């Protein structure tokens, strides 16, 4: 039986056309996805020329997690026209992965050759501190799922662009790097699971980004991943974890994170 759902690429093209029509911009060359806790950083990126509810775009599903606005902004940064996705949906909200990665595919269809994927993450390394931005050097997809269907054998050797990471370090030479472990959520990890992740080589842990990275690379875009350490992972401090803690850490770091993103994007 034929799949009655729209073709993902066609749906992305439809969304891209609406974005172009509503913003008056034929192509946006950079896209930014703001993760949990990153929403307050929007103000530091610059003034948007257009703000669209994501629910008005073909294929987009409004996010339900706290700290995700569900808006798409068109923002000029330096010589670039940037699509800012203020909020993302997660697989743990019950969505098929084709909808989770649809915003990235739509941004690519709208012209974005660079995807800046941000997230909130738990820190697993002793040298990582709450409020610290960390460049993602690689990831562990521990969700047991892929957004790709069929014979799409995408090379992920440099899933997170070394070129873009070097540009980010030109903006802030103190930026650390780490391996991000993507888990399904929505529950936080147990201390035993954190010890397992450390053994596997993870430095950061969260519930997003890995599927978007795979979809972006499959579409031919470069990816820069940036985690904001919003808490130390389970068992490290002995304190319980909460989403409120994540949002508070993001709010406290908002100006710095927004300024960092704006400066890095201007260097692209």
UniProtKB/Swiss-Prot annotation:
SUPFAM superfamilies: Purine and uridine phosphorylases. GO terms for biological process: deoxyguanosine catabolic process. Its EC number is 2.4.2.1. It catalyses: a purine 2'-deoxy-D-ribonucleoside + phosphate = a purine nucleobase + 2-deoxy-alpha-D-ribose 1-phosphate. Transmembrane segments: none annotated. Keywords: Glycosyltransferase, Transferase. Phosphate binds at residues 36, 68, 88-90, 120, 208. GO terms for molecular function: purine-nucleoside phosphorylase activity. Pathway: Purine metabolism; purine nucleoside salvage. GO terms for cellular component: cytoplasm. Belongs to the PNP/MTAP phosphorylase family. The purine nucleoside phosphorylases catalyze the phosphorolytic breakdown of the N-glycosidic bond in the beta-(deoxy)ribonucleoside molecules, with the formation of the corresponding free purine bases and pentose-1-phosphate. Cleaves guanosine, inosine, 2'-deoxyguanosine and 2'-deoxyinosine. Homotrimer. This is Purine nucleoside phosphorylase. It comes from Mycobacterium tuberculosis (strain ATCC 25618 / H37Rv).
């Amino acid at each position: 039986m034929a799949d009655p759902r729209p073709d993902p690429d066609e749906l992305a093209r439809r969304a891209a056309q609406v974005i172009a029509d509503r913003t008056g911009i034929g192509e946006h060359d950079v896209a930014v996805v703001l993760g949990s806790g990153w929403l307050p950083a929007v103000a530091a990126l610059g003034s948007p020329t257009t703000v669209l509810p994501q629910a008005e775009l073909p294929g987009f599903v409004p996010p339900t997690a706290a700290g995700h606005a569900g808006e798409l902004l068109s923002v000029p940064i330096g010589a670039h026209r940037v699509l800012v996705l203020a909020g993302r949906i997660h697989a743990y909200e019950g969505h098929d992965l084709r909808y989770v990665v649809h915003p990235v595919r739509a941004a690519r269809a709208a012209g974005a050759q660079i995807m800046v994927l941000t997230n909130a993450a738990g820190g697993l390394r002793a040298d990582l501190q709450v409020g610290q931005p960390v460049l993602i050097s690689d990831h562990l997809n521990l969700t047991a799922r892929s957004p790709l269907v069929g014979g799409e054998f995408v090379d992920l050797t440099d899933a997170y662009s070394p070129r873009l990471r070097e540009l980010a370090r030109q903006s802030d030479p103190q930026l650390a790097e780490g391996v991000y472990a993507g888990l399904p959520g929505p529950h936080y990890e147990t201390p035993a699971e954190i010890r397992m992740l450390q053994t596997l080589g993870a430095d950061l842990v969260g519930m997003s980004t890995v599927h978007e990275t795979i979809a972006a690379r499959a579409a031919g875009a470069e990816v820069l991943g940036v985690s904001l350490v919003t808490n130390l992972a389970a068992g490290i401090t002995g304190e319980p974890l909460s989403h409120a803690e994540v949002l508070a850490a993001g709010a406290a770091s908002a100006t710095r994170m927004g300024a960092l993103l704006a400066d890095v994007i201007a260097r692209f």
